[in-house]
Curated annotation (Swiss-Prot):
Membrane topology: Multi-pass membrane protein
GO cellular component: mitochondrial membrane
Designated name of the protein: NADH-ubiquinone oxidoreductase chain 6
Main subcellular location: mitochondrion
Enzyme class: translocase
Source superkingdom: Eukaryota
Gene3D superfamilies (alphabetical): NADH-ubiquinone/plastoquinone oxidoreductase chain 6, subunit NuoJ
Reactions catalysed, as given in the entry: a ubiquinone + NADH + 5 H(+)(in) = a ubiquinol + NAD(+) + 4 H(+)(out)
Keywords in alphabetical order: Electron transport, Membrane, Mitochondrion, NAD, Respiratory chain, Translocase, Transmembrane, Transmembrane helix, Transport, Ubiquinone
Listed EC numbers: 7.1.1.2
Compartments reported by the entry: Mitochondrion membrane
InterPro entries: ComplexI_Subunit6, NADH_UbQ/plastoQ_OxRdtase_su6, Nuo/plastoQ_OxRdtase_6_NuoJ
Function comment: Core subunit of the mitochondrial membrane respiratory chain NADH dehydrogenase (Complex I) that is believed to belong to the minimal assembly required for catalysis. Complex I functions in the transfer of electrons from NADH to the respiratory chain. The immediate electron acceptor for the enzyme is believed to be ubiquinone.
Species of the source: Patiria pectinifera
Length: 162
């Protein structure tokens, strides 16, 4: 049941990102997707990697997002097609409730290929996955530059009123 809940949270967060006109609700959806993704990673046995990912996300991307939305903020944020979101959310939640069987007892570790890799998590991150770590850092740098470039020339900025 916990996997259904995590997957429903991921789905609801991604629909919130997709349907939101304001960056505030988009960031809320991204936080919801990131938290549920890290929870899913930790349930599969990769808790150290999940912790590193959530610290990178909260420490890096949310700071960039707060800075960029402080420059170009809306006065009245809104979500487009709110009725569609409610219908879609109710359909997904009702599907999860109808498919839930309390007699199902599934262990994550009962799968043959899932192992607990907490003991080798940090060494894998820095030794064999060092290239991916550098690519992730480069992507964060590009996202910072893109956010700053997009918000630099905005005519309707909250700071211009000050």
């Amino acid at each position: 049941m916990i996997f259904y809940t995590v997957l429903v949270l991921m789905f609801l967060g991604s629909t919130l990102v997709f349907y939101s006109l304001s960056p505030y609700y988009g960031a809320l959806g991204l936080v919801l997707v990131a938290l549920s993704g890290c929870l899913l990673c930790s349930l599969l046995g990769f808790s150290f990697i999940a912790l590193v990912l959530i610290l990178i996300y909260v420490g890096g991307m949310l700071v960039v997002f707060v800075y960029s939305t402080a420059i170009s903020a809306e006065r009245y944020p809104s979500v487009s097609n709110f009725n569609e979101i409610l219908v879609l959310s109710s359909l997904v939640i009702s599907w999860g409730v109808l498919n839930f069987d309390p007699l199902i007892n599934v262990e994550v570790n009962s799968w043959g290929f899932v192992t607990n890799s907490d003991l080798v998590g940090a060494s894998n991150l820095y030794s064999s996955m060092g290239g991916y770590l550098l690519i992730g850092g480069y992507i964060l740098l590009v996202a910072l530059v893109v956010a700053l470039v997009l918000t630099y020339g905005s005519d309707y900025s909250i700071l211009k009123a000050l």
